[in-house]
Design a protein with these regions (language model features):
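Mixed-charge, low-complexity intrinsically disordered regions
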Residues: 81-82, 86-88, 113-118
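N-terminal leader/signal peptides at the extreme start of proteins
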Residues: 1-15
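Aliphatic-rich helix starts adjacent to a transmembrane/signal segment
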Residues: 40-58
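N-terminal amphipathic/basic membrane-interacting segments and domains
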Residues: 74, 78-82, 89, 95-99
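N-terminal single-pass transmembrane signal-anchor helix
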Residues: 12-38
Length: 139
């Protein structure tokens, strides 16, 4: 009888429970070693992404600041005269960004009016009334 059991056992193929447990333990050990490495790569990728986003924001803010505080240049189309000040045709005029309007008369080349408005101030000059200003800042 024992001989028969031994023969039956030799004919059966497969893994024993102990062999399966050993394989599972080896896989778990490998996974435990790999997980920290993978997490480091994920952290590095997130840091690189954050740095890239910050650089993009910096460039955008710099462009907006340059836009907001830059000066606009205009070439005088004709000779402009007003209150003893003459600007000859072709002269480059520099105006603060945000200037709303500057008008002149085509017939005689005189400057008729100028107005400027920013967040807290409104300034206007006209030939008839001269300078006027309003401070719109809340105090």
């Amino acid at each position: 009888m024992v001989k028969r059991l031994r023969e039956n056992r030799k004919n059966k193929k497969g893994f024993t429970l102990v062999e399966l447990i050993v394989v599972i333990v080896i896989i778990l050990v490998l996974a435990a070693v790999m997980v920290p490495s993978v997490l480091r790569y994920v952290d590095k990728a997130n840091q690189a992404n954050t740095k890239s986003d910050a650089a993009t924001i910096l460039v955008d803010v710099q462009a907006q600041i340059a836009d907001a505080y830059s000066a606009a240049t205009v070439t005088a189309p004709t000779d402009l005269k007003s209150n003893g000040v003459t600007v000859t045709k072709g002269t480059t005029l520099i105006a603060a960004k945000g200037a709303k309007a500057a008008t002149y008369s085509e017939t005689n080349g005189d400057l008729e009016s100028f107005s400027y408005c920013d967040t807290n101030h409104w300034i206007q000059w006209s030939k008839e009334k001269g300078w006027s200003a309003v401070d719109t800042a809340l105090k």
